[in-house]
C-alpha cells in the first residue's frame, strides 16, 4: 500500500485534485487560492483554482477546488478528488463520495463528528488554530499546512511565500504561524516514517 505522500507524487504526474469543503467564513476560498499560487507561482507546477459558495456570507456551503499538475491541465474542476478536506459535517456528508478509491480524506474533528470512511485522517484543525493564534478563522491555514506536510505536493517554502503574498495586510504573521502549526501536526502524525495510509 502507498503512503499519502507516495500517492500524491504519483497523481501529480497526471493531475492531483484537491477539494477543500466547509462553510462560508472558514477561509477555504483563500486557502484554495494560496494553494494554487504556491504550486504555480512558487512551485513551478501548473495549477487551476475554482470556487463555489452559497448565498449566505457565513455558514452556507463553501468549496474550493484546486488542480495541480506537472503538465497541462485540460479540465478545470475536480472530477474525483485525490484529497478531500472536510471542515464541516455537511461538507463531509456531501463530498466524500467524490474521493478516488485510493484518495485521502482529511477531517476537522473539531467540527465533524460522523466520519463517513475508515480512510479518513481526523485532525482537530479548528482547535489547533484557536490554540496557536487565538483565531478560529486561521483554521484554513492550519489545514493548508497539514495538507502540504502530509502530501508534499507543494513545499513549505512555496506555501509560506503564497501566504505572505495573499494574506490580508497585517495578518501575515498570524497566518504563517497557523500554517506552521499545520505542518507540525503533519510531522507529528507521520512520526518516525510512520506515514498515514489513505487507501
Description of each model-found segment:
Residues 1-199:
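Active-site cofactor/cluster-binding pocket
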Amino acid at each position: 500500500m502507498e503512503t499519502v505522500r507516495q500517492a500524491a507524487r504519483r497523481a501529480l504526474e497526471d493531475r492531483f485534485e484537491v477539494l477543500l469543503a466547509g462553510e462560508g467564513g472558514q477561509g477555504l476560498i483563500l486557502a484554495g487560492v494560496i494553494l494554487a499560487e504556491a504550486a504555480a507561482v512558487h512551485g513551478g507546477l501548473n495549477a487551476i483554482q475554482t470556487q463555489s459558495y452559497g448565498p449566505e456570507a457565513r455558514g452556507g456551503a463553501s468549496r474550493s477546488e484546486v488542480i495541480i499538475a506537472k503538465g497541462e491541465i485540460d479540465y478545470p474542476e475536480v472530477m474525483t478528488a485525490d484529497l478531500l478536506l472536510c471542515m464541516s459535517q455537511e461538507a463531509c456528508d456531501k463530498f466524500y463520495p467524490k474521493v478516488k478509491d485510493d484518495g485521502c480524506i482529511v477531517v476537522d474533528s473539531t467540527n465533524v463528528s460522523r466520519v463517513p470512511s475508515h480512510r479518513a485522517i481526523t485532525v482537530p484543525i479548528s482547535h489547533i488554530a484557536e490554540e496557536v493564534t487565538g483565531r478560529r478563522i486561521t483554521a484554513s491555514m492550519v489545514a493548508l499546512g497539514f495538507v502540504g506536510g502530509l502530501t508534499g505536493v507543494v513545499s513549505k517554502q512555496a506555501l509560506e511565500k503564497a501566504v505572505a503574498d495573499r494574506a490580508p495586510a497585517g495578518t501575515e504573521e498570524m497566518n504563517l504561524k497557523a500554517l506552521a502549526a499545520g505542518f507540525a501536526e503533519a510531522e507529528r502524525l507521520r512520526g518516525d516514517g510512520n506515514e498515514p495510509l489513505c487507501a
